[in-house]
């Protein structure tokens, strides 16, 4: 039996519900961020990976794009942020939308670049 693995994330990196988007000449992947062996999911800050659209074997870690404690309702960092997605607005800026825990609320952060950082 062959081992199944993620083709672009390093071992130990867990980004479920990934959302790929093409902005310019790169593919960006956004998603929830799980921690290895954590009792719950979506506990890490958001990160981003990207690759050139013409070489999807050359993935690059863009870094932390949004820290969960940045959310005004999550200053202690105890709430889960999950299912993020990014869109480019008509103003050219990038908007990161995410679900705020299981409270029926959405959050939004803004950046001038698709790889963040978002505020």
PLM ranges: what are they?
Residues 1-119:
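Carbohydrate-active catalytic/glycan-binding domains of CAZyme proteins
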């Amino acid at each position: 039996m062959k081992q199944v693995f993620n083709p672009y994330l390093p071992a130990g990196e867990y980004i479920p519900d990934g959302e790929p988007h093409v902005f310019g000449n790169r593919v960006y992947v956004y998603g929830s961020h799980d921690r290895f062996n954590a009792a719950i999911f979506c506990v890490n800050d958001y990160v981003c990976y990207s690759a050139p659209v013409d070489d999807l074997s050359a993935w690059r870690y863009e870094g932390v794009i949004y820290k969960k404690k940045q959310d005004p309702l999550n200053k202690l960092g105890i709430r889960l942020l999950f299912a993020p997605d990014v869109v480019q607005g008509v103003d050219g800026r990038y908007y990161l939308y995410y679900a705020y825990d299981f409270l029926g609320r959405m959050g939004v952060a803004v950046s001038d670049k698709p790889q963040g950082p978002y505020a």
